[in-house]
Amino acid sequence: MTDITLPPGDGSIQRVEPVDIQQEMQRSYIDYAMSVIVGRALPEVRDGLKPVHRRVLYAMLDSGFRPDRSHAKSARSVAETMGNYHPHGDASIYDTLVRMAQPWSLRYPLVDGQGNFGSPGNDPPAAMRYCVSGNSLVRLLFGKSIRIGDIVTGAQFNSDNPIDLKVLDRHGNPVVADYLFHSGEHQTYTVRTTEGYEITGTSNHPLLCLVNVGGIPTLLWKLIGEIRSGDYVVLQRIPPVEFGPADWYSTMEALLFGAFISGGFVFQDHAGFNSLDRDYFTMVVNAYDTVVGGLRCISSRITVSGSTLLELDVYNLIEFKKTRLSGLCGQRSADKLVPDWLWHSPSTVKRAFLQALFEGEGFSSILSRNIIEISYSTLSERLAADVQQMLLEFGVVSERYCHTVNEYKVVIANRAQVEMFFTQVGFGVTKQAKLIRDVVSMSPCVGMDINCVPGLATFIRKHCDNRWVEEDSFNQHNVDCVQHWHHHSAEIVGHIADPDIRAIVTDLTDGRFYYARVASVTDTGIQPVFSLHVDTEDHSFLTNGFISHNTEARLTPLAMEMLREIDEETVDFISNYDGRVQEPMVLPSRFPNLLANGSGGIAVGMATNIPPHNLYELADAVFWCLENHDADEETMLVAVMERVKGPDFPTAGLIVGSQGIADAYKTGRGSIRIRGVVEVEEDSRGRTSLVITELPYQVNHDNFITSIAEQVRTGRLAGISNVEDQGSDRVGVRIVIEIKRDAVAKVVLNNLYKHTQLQTSFGANMLSIVDGVPRTLRLDQMICYYVEHQLDVIVRRTTYRLRKANERAHILRGLVKALDALDEVITLIRASQTVDIARVGVVELLDIDDIQAQAILDMQLRRLAALERQRIIDDLAKIEVEIADLGDILAKPERRRGIIRNELTEIAEKYGDDRRTRIIAVDGDVNDEDLIAREEVVVTITETGYAKRTKTDLYRSQKRGGKGVQGAGLKQDDIVRHFFVCSTHDWILFFTTQGRVYRAKAYELPEASRTARGQHVANLLAFQPEERIAQVIQIRSYEDAPYLVLATRAGLVKKSKLTDFDSNRSGGIVAINLRDNDELVGAVLCAADGDLLLVSANGQSIRFSATDEALRPMGRATSGVQGMRFNADDRLLSLNVVREDTYLLVATSGGYAKRTSIEEYPMQGRGGKGVLTVMYDRRRGSLVGAIVVDEDSELYAITSGGGVIRTTARQVRQAGRQTKGVRLMNLGEGDTLLAIARNAEESADGVSVKVMISRSRVLSFFGSDSNTSPDRT
């Protein structure tokens, strides 16, 4: 250790101890680390809260911000918390309050917030403390307004002032403001629009703005500090609602004020007014006589131009100064303004002021290019701003600017606003008539409103190709022009097909708002600022026409369960940071909040990340622990893991696999893979899209979309043509990713899982504070600590109640003694000179203590009545029973556990809900079949590859000959090719024309209604481009048959063991190696001694044995051997397995068919050309189908025109091989028969279905019996 030389001193230092700096730094760092760990970053295991969360909740309770009361401004909750419990700045406190109010952050929110509390994307919550300057005008009812700083006269800095004031919200509706907040002095900024409208407020004051969000124009709140030049703010311009007749005197006073401002003068000893308009002059004189009265002089003179100028002069201003016009005395022109009394007046009074003002110094004119304009000029910048603001109160939008040096103009510069001025305000007399003539003379098609909704036209035209009817209607008109919507809204809306788009555009174009472009945001220094508390959902109010709002909060009912009975000494309290008040060390927490809502935090050298869980499941686990409190740790862990299935995130989503869950629950640490929910959809144009309806927990919605767009741009994500956010508060998350036509949906989805946060991991680290020390806990340990805490709470609560009951019983026993000796007590009290003497006497008389004696002396005379005496005796009896019950609770642990169970059951039933997050299996994990019920379903697969499964009970069993029930609605020329009943656990093998085989469990097919088409298998399986289904086979297991036989168009056949095709590869496997220009035609299951029948397109057929000697088994990656040879223009049409007592039924393109007994086909050697099965006839056409049937087999056929026939094989004439067949159906001109197939519903156990074919001429399938001929179309 280095020697230390102490500096010379004056003897005032009593003692200095040398300390090793390394040891001191180590000690200080450990102290700091533990302070952060215990005091800030980690939750307490008992209530699951960090100190700041606990303090916010307790401060809100202590301040009365409870769920049964109105919301309180968030700043009040923050101020109470910071002032009494948490002196670490308001930002962290407000962030905590906001998070506890966000339903996407907490599974069970503890704060009920109103206002803008952010979003799962990049939208931040509104700031806690935001205000506007004192001169901001707040809109009131009936056109009145008041400066916010004048609402409460003499309001103190940083004060909350109760008021009862009706203001207007963003929609122009009256709402109640019950508090004015004087927020002290703060730095302010002024937002000015290009038109000249201004609002001054703090940087965190929110204004309603029009923002482009993913190409959609959206109304969002932005802070003044976030607003930039070029942004668009929203101004409310709904004309005021007027009520009753105007006050005549006030109206005349306003008229006279407007006249003197525009055409008069008022000196200290002389006032006057003049005008060339006699009607206007007369109106002003009459107003003067009404308002002022007294002596005045009227004269006239001829001007240089020859006009008559009428003049009013007043030389005695005594009466004038008694009126509210006295403020004009000695006022310079540059200092003129609208006085407060006029702002406080209703719209009828303000209208009179504006009419007189514009009649005096206002002008209307038609400029070049048919532009009509109204203007007003003044030397006062303040007056120009006031006039512009007052016009806006009437719904008139104007521009204000400096015209020349020291001259300011207010201009109404387009026809729509001129018409609004003319209907809502108007000139006084003569000029109004001129304005009417000018408006009438203009063509209705010129001078229209230039007010548009920025970005609306682009948004509309972008969706023309897939969402709109009559695209040209939106390319030829100014659909973003508000005035165009005003005149033609019904016609425009009629062209819009999508209801969500209709809602967006109509809300923006209904005329309530004006979208003003921001010109500048400037620093306006430090000044007093104010805000209002408005008791509505969005808390909006109008200031200078801008739309402002605030956030408010109160505790949720579930948060009250966290704080329940905290006043019954259930937890320990400690002094706050300055010793003034007490705060709880932990909350009673009547439900397991740590696991229900989870927690996250980063401390020094450690971090916690506990996922949220389902309250029902947690309660079930707690109940087991209460009933089996003496179980060992291993048994308890297994039991709670059986009941708590896994995390349950507020944003739902999927958990992939259970290994990470098991790790987290068994060791306290684990990586849990989570995934969003994606559905494959196909629109009316056949385009495939991936639709994301749920995102993983804590994934930022906006950043996720941006990430996809960026990776598509850089080429990392392929196959995506468009990404669109269609989500809203109404529909929730809906991100539509449009897939390119040549892309495979499953491949794109897998890439999204790999390269984006559509699949991510939640790193569980179940670390919390236990007895002041951080510990990593297993699931069962967390639940046990919670149970121990609840047992302690019950003991402390019961002890408190027992003490209070004993105190009450003690007093009642004294009262009963007094009532038994009532006369003696009354005599003693009357004889006592002082209360103290009476108290001592009562103690000696009744043998009681001072507490009982005082209660007797405090007893009211009315309690001496007989009924009251009996009530005291009854109360004592009840309390004695209660004391015995409370004592029993303290004596019996099983009763305490029962109370916890009953109270938690009540909470879970009241606030619990179903699990949101589903757990799915992965390879090597629990099989999906363990999670899916085994049930019978109907599987439907169409010719073009659409597949679905349907519950069997949606189809009713019918007798033969019934009409059936409506089945799938299909596209033109599509038919149901495969239709069978199977178990949800059965395998379905899809063989494609390219020689590959894919498999899926029946439950993996989309479940759909009878009438739904389903989804294309290319979206369910990773089909390659151009692959089509050649055959579908259903098996329960790979032991159902020994062999699988495949046949190609070139006549090759291959027999392989069915078990060779048992593969887990999601991308399919090779079923047969195809040679050039060949494709797979058929696939059948075959026994070891079966026979095969091959039929060619030209009518040749060959039957041969499939024994191992005739057709040896081969591996999958082989081409097979020649099963049938063809002439040059022939090919294989079908592959069939021969069954006894069956027929080969063939059909031709001309609509002819026949059936031939299978015995007529001789056994031959493999590889020949076979024998003739039908005689070719040009009129009858070529062969289109050949299937093996029995007499009762049902079959159907479809034509190129969409016609369909359904009949039984018995109705088709039996004939020999070398015949042409008979007519199966009549064909229309140009129609041909496309295909025949056995009716797949034969295997559906009585299920009957009617297949719908879009645009088909025939929509009916008929069952038939032996006495019915086939129906023809």
Swiss-Prot record:
Enzymatic class: isomerase
Residues the record marks as active site: Y130 (o-(5'-phospho-dna)-tyrosine intermediate)
Protein name (database record): DNA gyrase subunit A
Annotated motif GyrA-box, positions: 958-964
Regulation acting on activity, per entry: DNA supercoiling is inhibited by fluoroquinolones; IC(50) 1 ug/ml for sitafloxacin.
Keyword set, alphabetical order: ATP-binding, Autocatalytic cleavage, Cytoplasm, DNA-binding, Isomerase, Nucleotide-binding, Protein splicing, Topoisomerase
Additional comment: Few gyrases are as efficient as E.coli at forming negative supercoils. Not all organisms have 2 type II topoisomerases; in organisms with a single type II topoisomerase this enzyme also has to decatenate newly replicated chromosomes.
Subunit and interaction comment: Heterotetramer, composed of two GyrA and two GyrB chains. In the heterotetramer, GyrA contains the active site tyrosine that forms a transient covalent intermediate with the DNA, while GyrB binds cofactors catalyzes ATP hydrolysis.
PANTHER family hit by this protein: DNA GYRASE SUBUNIT A, CHLOROPLASTIC_MITOCHONDRIAL, DNA GYRASE/TOPOISOMERASE SUBUNIT A
Family, per entry: Belongs to the type II topoisomerase GyrA/ParC subunit family.
